[in-house]
């Protein structure tokens, strides 16, 4: 969310073929829930393309980057590093402190994709567990960002969108922004 110091999400690790959907969803969740950018491992080409495409169609601002320097990204981060792991401190015991720190400093949220080395745990300012139970890293990211932004991310607008979803009780309603009266809809339960 552009009114605060930056929030970036680093996907730490990606196994092509196995993690494609999950890595893509890390990026989509970061975008939808207020982060300013996502950094993917260099081999996450398809995930990066998909998130860029969604950002182009549904608006931003949101940046997508790929890097071969995952550890250097963490080590050189100019603010605080939050590593999401089920083994970390309970979110509810540290979220106020992280939120307060974020008022002054950018936050890098590290989301593991495969076994995360101990160096990441040591480099993080906080190792945070959303439930301390096995769960999806996408779910953990969503809950963390909602706590970080205190729900404000749910009201954010998106600039330069080509398409916009019109909320409805039933069905799907998507309009082209240039032609607001042209809607594409489908009955509830059709497709995604």
Swiss-Prot record:
Question: What Gene3D superfamilies does UniProt report for this protein, alphabetically?
Answer: 3.40.1280.10
User: Can you tell me which residues bind S-adenosyl-L-methionine?
Assistant: 84, 112-116
The entry's protein name is tRNA (cytidine(56)-2'-O)-methyltransferase
Keywords associated with the record: Cytoplasm, Methyltransferase, S-adenosyl-L-methionine, Transferase, tRNA processing
InterPro entries tied to this protein: Alpha/beta_knot_MTases, tRNA_m1G_MTases_N, tRNA_mtfrase_aTrm56
EC no. given is 2.1.1.206
Entry superkingdom: Archaea
GO MF, any single term: tRNA (cytidine(56)-2'-O)-methyltransferase activity
What's its top-level EC category?
A: transferase
Q: Which reaction does it catalyse?
A: cytidine(56) in tRNA + S-adenosyl-L-methionine = 2'-O-methylcytidine(56) in tRNA + S-adenosyl-L-homocysteine + H(+)
Does the record's keyword annotation contain tRNA processing? yes
Question: Origin organism of this chain?
Answer: Halobacterium salinarum (strain ATCC 700922 / JCM 11081 / NRC-1)
| Family statement drawn from the similarity comment of this UniProt entry | Belongs to the aTrm56 family.
Organismal lineage: Archaea, Methanobacteriati, Methanobacteriota, Stenosarchaea group, Halobacteria
Quote the subunit structure annotation: Homodimer.
Tell me, what is an example of a GO biological process annotation in this record?
tRNA nucleoside ribose methylation
């Amino acid at each position: 969310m552009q009114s605060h110091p930056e929030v970036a999400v680093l996907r730490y690790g990606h196994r092509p073929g196995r993690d494609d959907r999950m890595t893509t969803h890390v990026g989509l969740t970061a975008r939808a829930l207020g982060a300013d950018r996502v950094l993917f491992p260099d081999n996450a080409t398809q995930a990066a393309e998909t998130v860029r495409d969604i950002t182009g169609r549904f608006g931003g601002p949101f940046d997508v980057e790929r890097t071969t320097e995952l550890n250097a990204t963490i080590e050189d981060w100019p603010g605080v590093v939050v590593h999401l792991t089920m083994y970390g401190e309970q979110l509810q015991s540290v979220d106020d402190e992280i939120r307060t720190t974020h008022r002054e400093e950018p936050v890098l949220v590290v989301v593991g994709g495969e076994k995360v080395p101990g160096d990441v745990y040591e480099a993080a300012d906080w190792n945070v567990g959303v439930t301390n139970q096995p769960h999806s890293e996408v779910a953990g990211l969503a809950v963390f960002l909602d706590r970080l932004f205190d729900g404000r991310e749910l009201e954010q607008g998106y600039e330069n969108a080509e398409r916009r979803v019109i909320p409805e009780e039933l069905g799907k309603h998507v309009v082209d922004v240039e032609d607001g009266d042209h809607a594409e809809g489908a009955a509830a339960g059709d497709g995604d």
